[in-house]
Amino acid sequence: MIYNLVIYIYLFGVKVAGLFSAKPAKMVKGHREVFDILRNKIDKNARYIWFHAASLGEFEQGRPLIERIRKEHPEYKILQTFFSPSGYEVRKNYQGADLVCYLPFDTPRNVRRFVELANPCMVFFIKYEFWQNYLNELHRRGIPTYSVSSIFRPNQIFFRWYGKRYSEVLRTFAHLFVQNEVSKELLATIGVTDVTVVGDTRFDRVLDICYQAKQLPLVEKFKGDSLTFVAGSSWGSDEDIFIKYFNEHPEMKLVIAPHVVSDSHLREILDKVKRPCIRYTEATEENVTQADCLIIDCYGLLSSIYRYGEISYIGGGFGVGIHNVLEAAVYGIPVIFGPNNKKFREAQHLLEQKGGFEVTGYDDFKRLMDKFLSDEAYLQQAGKAAGNYVNHNAGALEKIMKDITL
């Protein structure tokens, strides 16, 4: 079978890469240990609901559903699996699951062993997870399996003339909860009709984050009564733009949470900033008020820090692509980003709603910021548009909960 051959080639490639690189080496080791973990830690008397996410982003989409089920149905235990180290390494101690491990490669032998040991009573695959052997085995055993926050496009293999056989895997799902009408219509063209348009659970997730945002006394003290600009996940090319403007505008304060927190990058930022600046890890209630720029030199705070800003900037738009715009928009503040945003649906929608703003360089940025700083009504209107966009698109979680039987 061609599919299995591709999987074995991929597995071989990862093992070879693991000889030279730490990330695939972690992956190989983690996949090898899965079966011992399941044998030793699975409670054979419990009923498990299994959630699978390829990586961290997909996990965050599934997280609202995990936490709702855990809250309303504590009689079930949660098994969370990841395919990549970038998800597993960050969330291996996630308290919302009873067991977190890797998902082994989709070979027939791995699949039989994994499903036998895990023995789930229900399964949720998040977004783009369509592992043929796993799905066929779960279907064969009569285990209801759902696709959550999935999205389909015409160029995917399922809708090509040569993908008819692979498209059969979509029929193994008990139901598909898709993000938009286009996905539902595409699936209908190949006869897949157990589909409901629910939207994207990421909107529910960022609302949860907003409601649970940490109080950060040092950031609050730093802000005081000043208009504060929060730059999240920034890269050097982003910082060249907004730091230049900040240096020339003493009426505003700046919080920078760089994407890469390294000594060399932090030194680069400090060299660019020409006003009093302090690192978060060195800040105290006494010295933080003397600074105009606060550099967040640790991880895990950004989603809570946006609440202290009047204007936000999301990095990556002058490089590989922008980062999470929803984490800022949920607080009802305008979101600025660079030009590499075309593949990010939320950014495109924010642009349409006038809550997001694209800048292609310093001149664009300066014109926009001058407008924000001189026109309070314009600033408030943009922030309201961003917040409304998130609120109006939330609700996927409730629709999913109504359609599953627990």
Features from the language model and the residues they span:
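Nucleotide-activated sugar donor-binding and catalytic core shared by glycosyltransferases
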Residues: 1-406
